[in-house]
Swiss-Prot record:
Its EC number is 4.1.1.21, 6.3.2.6. This is Bifunctional phosphoribosylaminoimidazole carboxylase/phosphoribosylaminoimidazole succinocarboxamide synthetase. In the N-terminal section; belongs to the SAICAR synthetase family. In the C-terminal section; belongs to the AIR carboxylase family. Class II subfamily. One of its GO terms (cellular component) is cytosol. GO terms for molecular function: ATP binding; phosphoribosylaminoimidazole carboxylase activity; phosphoribosylaminoimidazolesuccinocarboxamide synthase activity. Residues 2-260 are annotated as: SAICAR synthetase domain. Residues 261-266 are annotated as: Linker. It catalyses: 5-amino-1-(5-phospho-D-ribosyl)imidazole-4-carboxylate + L-aspartate + ATP = (2S)-2-[5-amino-1-(5-phospho-beta-D-ribosyl)imidazole-4-carboxamido]succinate + ADP + phosphate + 2 H(+); 5-amino-1-(5-phospho-D-ribosyl)imidazole-4-carboxylate + H(+) = 5-amino-1-(5-phospho-beta-D-ribosyl)imidazole + CO2.
Length: 425
């Protein structure tokens, strides 16, 4: 094991077909997930040694978990540790495979006769399967999972927990689907697992997401598939066939790092009419940072220095970086409308209204001449979010943070409702 000389590794906690899990004696609540150079299909009815697969799988999982973690998805991932292992929070695994897909293919067609391959699901289709090798992982309903009354790390898996995993599965699929699109790859479907963190008692995405976990079709073309299906489809396993499978896996591993970047640049420029509005603008900048969007603050008055306002506008128009302008001006807001009337870039007015004159001042942002499409958002955080939604159309990293934020808000409401109901009992 590559990491044995640097980590104080304890007993083996679990061994599966393609990985082993070890306790870390110096890091309570953490484990080491060690991948194997083994590939399997059909619940290990077919299995082969594939040199280098452990490193490939570990790289893919580490990149995908990093992508999801940075977006805001709770994952059982701490850091990559060597070429073939990573460190993660220890979890008690929930024995369910959650499958989510956009395109009908594979076993779905067998289970749903009459549905043609290529049928698309809107929203993505979520299914669950009980992990039971002896019975070929039978499909379960949500009701069966609830009725099982599983308890992991002290958390009983009830309706709330099932709903959380179902919604998280869809969000995770959509984030990965969106992330693969810039690479001209279609994420057809995927399977994931959740666990309960033994320390926080939270449900988190766990196990691995590697090239065994999904169907990935370059250019949306099944004949170009780069996932484990290419191994399943081998009529006979030969050295040449395994080499072809390995090349497919290497192809994915080379590109997965690109998912952590975006070629689409973005920027928010906040124009304030006075430094007295700095506190309001700092809130916008902080919120932009949460979405990974660079934000610059400038001071200019469209009333007192319109020439300088337009010069600043031209400065940002000239460097080719996609930009959203946010105008922050109290009292009579000339800044937003003047900017909007002189640029093709999006402009958001975010006036810092005061209790005394706010009801009157806001009309200078709302009632505008024809030909102006300047939006008005009163919340500093809301204006940053709207800018993020604009950039998210072409930037998968920004979009992923938005999607994860929607999921996390939904989960917090679901958990709050559960807590209130328990208090009423």
């Amino acid at each position: 094991m590559a990491t044995a000389e640097v980590l104080n590794i304890g007993k083996k906690l679990y061994e599966g077909k393609t990985k082993e899990v070890y306790e870390l004696l110096d890091s309570p609540g953490k484990v080491l997930l060690q991948s194997k150079d083994q590939i399997t299909a059909g619940n290990a009815a077919r299995k082969n040694h594939l040199e280098g697969k452990a490193a490939i799988s570990n790289k893919i999982t580490s990149c995908i978990f990093q992508l999801l973690q940075e977006a805001g998805i709770k994952t059982a991932f701490t850091r990559k540790c060597g070429e073939t292992a990573f460190i993660a929070p220890q979890c008690e695994m929930i024995p369910i495979e959650w499958v989510c897909g956009r395109i009908a293919t594979g076993s779905f067609l067998k289970r749903n006769p009459g549905v043609k391959e290529g049928y698309k699901f809107y929203p993505p289709k979520v299914e669950l399967f009980f992990k039971d090798d002896a019975n070929n992982d039978p499909q379960w309903s949500a009701e069966q999972l609830i009725a099982a009354k599983f308890c992991f790390a002290g958390l009983v898996i009830g309706q709330t927990e099932v709903d959380i995993m179902s919604h998280a599965t869809q969000a995770i699929f959509e984030i990965l689907e969106k992330s693969w699109l810039p690479q001209n790859c279609t994420l057809v479907d995927m399977k994931i697992e959740f666990g309960v963190d033994v320390t926080t008692k939270e449900i988190v995405l766990a196990d691995v997401i590697d090239n065994d976990s999904w169907r990935l079709w370059p250019s949306g073309d099944r004949s170009q598939q780069k996932d484990k299906q290419s191994y399943r489809d081998l009529k006979e396993v030969t050295p040449e066939g395994l080499q072809m499978v390995k090349k497919n896996f290497e192809w994915v591993a080379e590109r997965v790092e690109l998912l952590l970047k975006s070629e689409s640049q973005c920027r928010v420029v906040v124009l304030m009419g006075s430094t007295s509005d700095l506190g309001h603008c700092e809130k916008i900048k902080k919120a932009c940072g949460n979405f990974g969007i660079p934000c610059e603050l400038r001071v200019t008055s469209a009333h007192k220095g319109p020439d300088e306002t337009l010069r600043i506008k031209a400065e940002y128009e000239g460097d080719g970086i996609p930009t959203v302008f946010v105008a922050v001006a109290g009292r009579s807001n000339g800044l937003g409308p003047v900017m909007c009337g002189n640029t093709a870039y999006p402009v958001i007015s975010c006036p810092p209204l005061t209790p005394d004159w706010g009801a009157q001042d806001v009309w200078s942002s709302l009632r505008l001449p024809s030909g102006l499409g300047c939006s008005t958002i009163l919340s500093p955080e809301g204006s940053a979010q709207f800018a993020a939604q604009i950039f998210g159309l072409n930037n998968h990293l920004v979009w992923s943070k938005l999607r994860a934020s929607i999921l996390n808000t939904w989960i917090s409401l679901k958990q709050a409702d559960k807590k209130i109901r328990e208090c009423n009992l």
